[in-house]
């Protein structure tokens, strides 16, 4: 029996969170390489800690990239520009350890080189995409508000409106659902790193008035909504000084905030031959078009692959009982409409471009930027036609 009245919570972290610093560095390196050589194979991992950034991985490319320069530019743009923060773009050490892609993997993802002649998947695995009609961007409401809160904290910091904020921040939003529909925001948590000399009450009032109330619609707040602002009382030590950051540790923040499922693979630092990334983008594209076509209010798509094999080993569609047709019928329509072989995904979504640094903070999904081709809803008419609607 489905729950009829419940709270669902999602979180987001800002571009200055140490794990997100690592994601952005990995994707900035990927972009710098793709800008010169679009056939590159990139798997770039980053670790950031007090006074140091380390990049490592497997990269096969004809591009010539000055990796330390890219790393420092990302750290500067985020706002770590003072050694008092324990992490500073000008003075941090940058260490690199880069190898080439394994030839055994390469032959499986290079057209004509492996047992199968088509470009195969870069690894086995399962990937999910999700969409629902709770927001205009067809994303769950909790993660949508959570991302907007962390983005707003970045905006007021960089614009100079709240000069005492520093780059590392987090948000969390709990939404009440009744009969599977979001009706109100129950709890908002925001935490932001700050200068040591700001009074707590000044910080709290500023974050409520200039962040929370600027993001969450007034009709979703009521007298029972709870605000928790920097609930430890002090957040001066933050960023890579406060916690070691690693690429790929915020996979739920990157996707749907815990709604839907996740196959476990991270995105950042991976070129689109890695289906962890490209097939997850494709699954979102499929699910979003199904919901936009009003074939269902909610849609989850699973795609699974074998390494070196182009055709997915399985495609599953679940509409959670909200479909105008049975899920297996929508799955049949999806298989007819979308080509989910890796090379076709790359072509359909035009993924061999330096577009990835923008994805690495504030969510890979639900932001309708021109570069985010997987957010298009250009298959609606075709899907409705196939469904006979």
UniProtKB/Swiss-Prot annotation:
Localization per record: Cytoplasm
Binding site for Mg(2+): 19
Pathway: Amino-acid biosynthesis; S-adenosyl-L-methionine biosynthesis; S-adenosyl-L-methionine from L-methionine: step 1/1
Positions of L-methionine binding: 58, 101, 243, 274
Top EC class for this record: transferase
GO CC, one annotated term: cytoplasm
GO molecular function: ATP binding; magnesium ion binding; methionine adenosyltransferase activity
Ranges for region Flexible loop: 101-111
Cofactor binding description: Binds 2 divalent ions per subunit. Binds 1 potassium ion per subunit.
GO biological process: one-carbon metabolic process; S-adenosylmethionine biosynthetic process
EC number: 2.5.1.6
Chain positions recorded as ATP binding sites: 17, 168-170, 234-235, 243, 249-250, 266, 270
Keywords linked to the UniProt accession: ATP-binding, Cytoplasm, Magnesium, Metal-binding, Nucleotide-binding, One-carbon metabolism, Potassium, Transferase
Coiled coil residues, start to end: none
Quaternary structure annotation from Swiss-Prot or TrEMBL: Homotetramer; dimer of dimers.
NCBIfam families (alphabetical): metK (TIGR01034)
Family to which the UniProt record says this protein belongs: Belongs to the AdoMet synthase family.
Stored HAMAP family: S_AdoMet_synth1
Protein name (record): S-adenosylmethionine synthase
Provenance organism: Syntrophotalea carbinolica (strain DSM 2380 / NBRC 103641 / GraBd1) (Pelobacter carbinolicus)
Organism lineage string: Bacteria, Pseudomonadati, Thermodesulfobacteriota, Desulfuromonadia, Desulfuromonadales
Gene designation per UniProt: metK
